[in-house]
């Protein structure tokens, strides 16, 4: 906008409502006709502690999201997920795969920020860590249009994921650094790699 820094895309400005509040992620596995909701998760996008610094893809996440009370969960189902999934079916665009809704909660009101046709990162890791069923079996059931008679088993435990990033992330960051991790004998601790 200023001095043409953004080129053609900076010539038009779109003003939107500023919304504020905690952001949560809700995922559904869909087979084109039916869908199964996964537990909620909440990630933290700022690079520094106490919600400071630049936004990132996510510096950590936990599941379930404590802000998702029974009341909020019902609102999410009835105001967002059911209308979306049923709308896709009614319009002749049934969806097969994982659908991810990024939502913001403010004063018990739900605002939809985005929908993605994928899992979210880093929210997926804490969610899947709570899964007692086979992810491969779930995906195969979705492909075969057989989700209606399946019940996913989840642990009641809470799960947390922490991202460790190179110095300087998310801007110019160090690369080609050795990562050393002591042997992990704790079954409640899993290590996931990305960009290593």
Residue ranges and their predicted role:
Residues 53, 62-66, 186-196:
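Glycine-rich phosphate/nucleotide-binding loop
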Residues 1-125:
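Internal nucleotide-binding/catalytic subdomain
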């Amino acid at each position: 906008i200023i001095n043409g820094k953004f080129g053609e895309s900076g010539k038009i400005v779109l003003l939107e409502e500023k919304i504020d509040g905690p952001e949560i992620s809700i995922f559904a596995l869909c087979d084109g006709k039916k869908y199964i909701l996964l537990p909620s998760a909440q990630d933290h996008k700022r690079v520094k502690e106490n919600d400071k610094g630049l936004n990132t893809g996510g510096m950590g996440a936990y599941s379930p999201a404590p802000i998702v009370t029974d009341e909020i969960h019902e609102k999410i189902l009835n105001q967002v997920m059911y209308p979306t999934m049923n709308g896709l079916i009614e319009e002749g665009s049934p969806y097969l795969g994982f659908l991810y809704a990024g939502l913001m909660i403010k004063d018990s009101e739900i605002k939809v920020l985005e929908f993605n046709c994928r899992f979210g990162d880093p929210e997926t890791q804490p969610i899947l860590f709570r899964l007692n069923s086979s992810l491969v079996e779930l995906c195969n059931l979705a492909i075969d249009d057989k989700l209606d008679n399946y019940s996913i088993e989840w642990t009641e435990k809470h799960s947390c994921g922490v991202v460790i990033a190179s110095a300087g992330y998310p801007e110019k960051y160090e690369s080609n650094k050795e990562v050393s991790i002591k042997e992990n004998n704790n079954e409640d601790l899993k290590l996931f790699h990305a960009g290593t």
